Amino acid sequence: MTLITPPFPTNRLRRMRRTEALRDLAQENRLSVKDLIWPIFITDVPGADVEISSMPGVVRRTMDGALKAAEGSRDAGHSRDLPVPLTDPAVKTETCEMAWQPDNFTNRVIAAMKQAVPEVAIMTDIALDPYNANGHDGLVRDGILLNDETTEALVKMALAQAAAGADILGPSDMMDGRVGAIRQAMEAAGHKDIAILSYAAKYASAFYGPFRDAVGASSALKGDKKTYQMNPANSAEALRNVARDIAEGADMVMVKPGMPYLDIVRQVKDAFGMPTYAYQVSGEYAMLMAAVQNGWLNHDKVMLESLMAFRRAGCDGVLTYFAPAAAKLIGA
């Protein structure tokens, strides 16, 4: 696009900023409640259904709390929820069998949500870390994370979530080939209409800390995740990952984290034109909330500005812990 800008005073850019009505006419991007996906922390661990200290205003929810949250999502108009489990350490193992049990707590919550509030689209997180004794997203042997064996486990996990009623599967593990394996398994099992939102460009970021506290993975994690999550210095690699996942059957793609990687969002959207999402992760949320609590930033203004940045960068939607608060301000 070639920009043609007449010289001043023929062109006075402030003309279209003079009143709110004129500013609205010139506004290029808009934020809607339909752009929001709400990650909800869930737990059946006794006494764990409390506010998460590193994420002010965010709580872990029992089954009843999760169902009320889904009802709230429907009523507010952001009818897309992602239940994320805090798993009892007693059931975590290095083989992660609980991840694909049909009656694990996550799958029970998915089924109950779909029965109680069928209008809400349920997205899932497919990775082994909530069930892994060593805190990793995949199976580990002799200090090495096993790609192909992990993919087999993720397929079983995806099938169990699909059977429970999930609408969108979200493989977040960053194993090579897992999107294709999950897509083939869905077709073979008759789940041809279940969508895959691939965490295609997930970086080995320092912004995940509060999330790992929320799901009890911080103390369990042995080492780091740099052998499977992306180097924060890389951008061309993100495009290769996205291209591969689209070819393997992803219906939507995600960049994670969000705000520090909006350049990646823009590149992905421009290159592929696919439905593109980003995750405003726990560290981003905690950073803004800490400034709000100290009186340094205005909660509502900084929340909406941060979410608008995702839309301006090319996101079709945002996974954000701000979803309920943002929905109240935006309105249906």
UniProtKB/Swiss-Prot annotation:
Pathway it acts in? Porphyrin-containing compound metabolism; protoporphyrin-IX biosynthesis; coproporphyrinogen-III from 5-aminolevulinate: step 1/4
Question: In the Enzyme Commission scheme, what number(s) does this protein have?
Answer: 4.2.1.24
> Coding gene?
hemB
Q: Which GO terms describe its cellular component?
A: cytosol
What SUPFAM superfamilies does its record include? Aldolase
Q: Where is the active site?
A: K202 (schiff-base intermediate with substrate), K256 (schiff-base intermediate with substrate)
Quaternary organization = Homohexamer.
Which superkingdom does the taxonomy of this entry point to?
Bacteria
- Please provide the record's keywords in A-Z order: Heme biosynthesis, Lyase, Porphyrin biosynthesis
Q: Which organism is it from?
A: Rhodobacter capsulatus (Rhodopseudomonas capsulata)
Q: What does the UniProt record say this protein does?
A: Catalyzes an early step in the biosynthesis of tetrapyrroles. Binds two molecules of 5-aminolevulinate per subunit, each at a distinct site, and catalyzes their condensation to form porphobilinogen.
Q: What is this protein identified as?
A: Delta-aminolevulinic acid dehydratase
